[in-house]
Amino acid sequence: MEHSRERGRSSNMRHNSREPYENPSRSRSLSRDPNQVDRRQPRSASQIRVPNLFHRKKTDALIVPPAPKDICPTLKKGFLCDSKFCKKDHQLDSLNDHELLLLIARRTCGIIESNSQITSPKDMRLANPTAEDFSQGNSPKLTLAVLLQIAEHWATRDLRQIEDSKLRALLTLCAVLTRKFSKSQLGLLCETHLRHEGLGQDQADSVLEVYQRLHSDKGGNFEAALWQQWDRQSLIMFISAFLNIALQTPCESSSVVVSGLATLYPAQDNSTPSEATNDTTWSSTVE
């Protein structure tokens, strides 16, 4: 009995001498060096990194597509346009080098410069106008019917001598009416615009981008950028074209919507709904 106890004790001692660092209370082995002392200390409040949750988004200046240019054919031939009825673009920077040199050569021969070359600068304060920037009158409530009346009135006016505040308001009118169109109709609106102005397909991308960005404009940022970056004549050409085509261009393309609304036409009118009577008298003078 004594002999067996001694044998058991000696086997335990040999086992302990083989594994001197094993901790019998832990079944998992340590992944780091057991001799390494954990010297980490809790961080103070000043050392704790707090994530910055409120980053201010950097807003760069909006990139506006170039204005569609319908250059005066007289100007492209090297002659100054003296017609008061020409509504084409007369900006010299629209000409290529050959056309510009030809114009300069003819200009030095004594041709008098036309007044159509002079464009007045815009009031840049109106990029983001306030109510005080416009003359306040007894205007009617702004309903859809009133919007259409305003558009019909200004579509027939010559905007070349219009004051800046009214031109800025007309740009807003174009943006508001563009958003009344279905998004699927913006392509048709662009094509109608090109045909009305006699512009080539090389201008289609710029015109379509303007309509798309006006349609999705939030807070009027793109509208303000248009006012700042387009020259006065380009704005007048775009606004005039839009007001002339907007009231004749279909605003919906869904066959369900179109066929459903077609059933609401008055019985005596087989083509289009009858025109509403114009109860509001608009001033026909352009200041």
UniProtKB/Swiss-Prot annotation:
The coding gene here is VP30
- Quaternary structure and partners: Homohexamer; hexamerization is essential for RNA binding. Interacts with the nucleoprotein/NP; this interaction plays both essential and inhibitory roles in viral RNA synthesis. Interacts with VP35. Interacts with host STAU1. Interacts (via C-terminus) with host RBBP6 isoform 1. Interacts with host DICER1; this interaction prevents TARBP2/TRBP binding to DICER1 and thus allows the virus to counteract host RNA silencing.
Native source organism of the sequence: Reston ebolavirus (strain Philippines-96) (REBOV)
Question: What function does the entry list?
Answer: Multifunctional protein that acts as a viral transcriptional activator. Promotes read-through of an RNA hairpin in the NP open reading frame to enhance viral transcription. Mechanistically, nonphosphorylated VP30 hexamers form a ternary complex with the viral leader RNA. Clamps the RNA template and the complex VP35-polymerase L together, thereby increasing the polymerase affinity for the RNA template to increase transcription initiation despite the presence of RNA secondary structures. Also assists stop-start transcription at gene junctions to promote transcription of downstream genes.
Can you list the GO cellular component terms from the UniProt entry? host cell cytoplasm; viral nucleocapsid
Q: Where is this region: RNA-binding?
A: 26-40
Modification after translation, per record? Phosphorylated by host. Phosphorylation negatively regulates the transcription activation. Phosphorylation and dephosphorylation take place in viral inclusion bodies and are largely influenced by the presence of NP. Dephosphorylated by host PPP2R5C; this dephosphorylation enhances viral transcription and is mediated by NP.
| A biological process term (GO) from this entry | symbiont-mediated suppression of host innate immune response
What name does the UniProt record give this protein?
A: Transcriptional activator VP30
Which Pfam families does the record associate with it?
Transcript_VP30
Which residues belong to zinc fingers classed as C3H1-type?
A: 72-90
